């Protein structure tokens, strides 16, 4: 008889620690420096999600500036920097300064990992709000994150005459999505182009969008008429705790992209895009000409996105089933064009053949997003 060696959930996982807060905490988890290990930070990410926190994981090899930009654009309550490479005294003050430079010196920095006891005082003196050494329990970390939350104010505090544009946009988006009161003078305008990218989980949507943004920003450097671009990436919210793991930034090299595009991750339940139209207007009002909207992609019902965007790209991959199965899903009806991603995988020819039966005059574009293949052609089609 089979035995259960481990329960599917634990008491820690089921406990929503954030229900009584003004809003669910938004925490940016990042690894600075050359440290290539992320198992520990992934454990923390899951624990935070299972506590009701919205966790943005930026991945390995981040610079202080890339983390600061991410925290600003995501309107984070706290940055949690994991350090394992003995560079905390060097990178810590650089991160604190970078937050000042990007207009969010008020975001506290928590640092954890291999931190010698003799360095803790120095870290606090340079502006690190909390330090967590090896052996700190997940309960203590979760409680510290909960304690970091403060009610959102409509206008970002700034030492200058006006807050940084991206910082203020991030706050406007947060308040809109959470049902709060946005400043009355927030500029609003629909971007020139609003492009939806949808498809099933694992189809490579995040990688595809990151490649599209890279190609777009390269073109915009030589053609100012394109303007700037932004991304809204939606991920599912836990039906049990209300937490979320927002991992779309993992696919983006922000060390190169920097401030050339605005990226924002948001968590929703099901297809609840109730705040999307208002957010789109805020993005356009902030001066972004093109907006890519990446959907949750949770299954057959991801169709409502078409109500909010100008063009919809449906991403498919080999092995998803024959034409009847794809037609049954209903999602093919909303496509303005089809993207056959992972075109180097077995079954690609069969996928394209089956799609031709339902595509009509709609374009079918083959891509290998991880290698950048087909991305220029896809962007041409989306901008046409």
Where are these regions (language model features)?
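Long, well-ordered amphipathic alpha-helical subdomains in the mid-to-C-terminal portions
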Residues: 163-174, 369, 377-384
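Residues at the beta-strand->loop junction immediately N-terminal to the Walker
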Residues: 30, 198-201
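ATP-binding Walker
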Residues: 35, 200-203
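Cofactor-cradling patches in redox/metallo enzymes
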Residues: 34, 41-143
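Conserved C-terminal guanine-recognition region of P-loop GTPase G domains, centered on the G4
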Residues: 299-362
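Canonical P-loop GTPase G-domain recognition
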Residues: 122-138, 142-144, 334-383
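Nucleotide-state-sensitive switch-loop elements of NTP-binding domains
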Residues: 136, 169, 173-192, 203, ...
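Extreme N-terminal, non-catalytic leader segments
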Residues: 2-14, 131, 139-194
């Amino acid at each position: 008889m089979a035995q259960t060696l481990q329960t599917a959930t634990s008491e820690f996982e089921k406990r929503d620690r954030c229900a009584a807060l003004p809003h669910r905490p938004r925490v940016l988890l990042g690894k600075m420096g050359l440290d290539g290990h992320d198992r520990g930070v992934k454990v923390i990410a899951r624990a935070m999600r299972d506590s009701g926190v919205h966790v943005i994981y930026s991945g390995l090899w981040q610079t202080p500036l890339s983390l600061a930009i991410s925290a600003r654009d995501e309107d984070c309550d706290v940055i949690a920097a994991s350090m394992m490479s003995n560079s905390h005294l060097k990178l810590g003050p650089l991160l604190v300064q970078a937050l000042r430079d990007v207009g969010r010196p008020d975001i506290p920095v928590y640092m954890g990992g291999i931190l010698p006891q003799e360095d803790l005082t120095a870290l606090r003196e340079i502006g690190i709000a909390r330090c967590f050494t090896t052996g700190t329990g997940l309960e203590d970390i979760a409680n510290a994150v909960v304690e970091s939350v403060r009610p959102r104010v409509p206008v970002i505090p700034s030492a200058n005459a006006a807050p940084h544009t991206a910082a203020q946009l991030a706050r406007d988006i947060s308040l809109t999505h959470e049902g709060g009161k946005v400043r009355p003078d927030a500029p609003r305008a629909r971007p020139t182009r609003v492009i939806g990218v949808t498809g099933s989980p694992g189809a490579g949507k995040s990688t595809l969008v990151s490649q599209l943004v890279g190609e777009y920003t390269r073109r915009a450097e030589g053609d100012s008429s394109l303007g700037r671009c932004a991304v809204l990436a939606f991920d599912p919210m836990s039906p049990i705790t209300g937490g979320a793991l927002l991992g779309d930034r993992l696919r983006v090299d922000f060390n190169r992209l920097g401030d050339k595009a605005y990226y924002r991750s948001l968590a929703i339940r099901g297809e609840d895009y109730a705040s999307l139209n208002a957010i789109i207007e805020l993005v356009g009002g902030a001066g972004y000409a093109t907006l890519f909207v990446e959907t949750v992609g949770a299954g057959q019902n991801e169709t409502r996105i078409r109500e909010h965007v100008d063009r919809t790209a449906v991403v498919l991959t080999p092995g998803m089933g024959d034409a009847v199965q794809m037609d049954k899903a209903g999602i093919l009806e909303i496509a303005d064009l089809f993207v056959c991603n992972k075109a180097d995988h077995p079954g690609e020819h069969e996928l394209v053949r089956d799609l031709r039966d339902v595509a009509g005059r709609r374009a079918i574009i083959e891509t290998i997003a991880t290698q950048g293949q087909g991305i220029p052609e896809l962007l041409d089609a989306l901008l046409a």
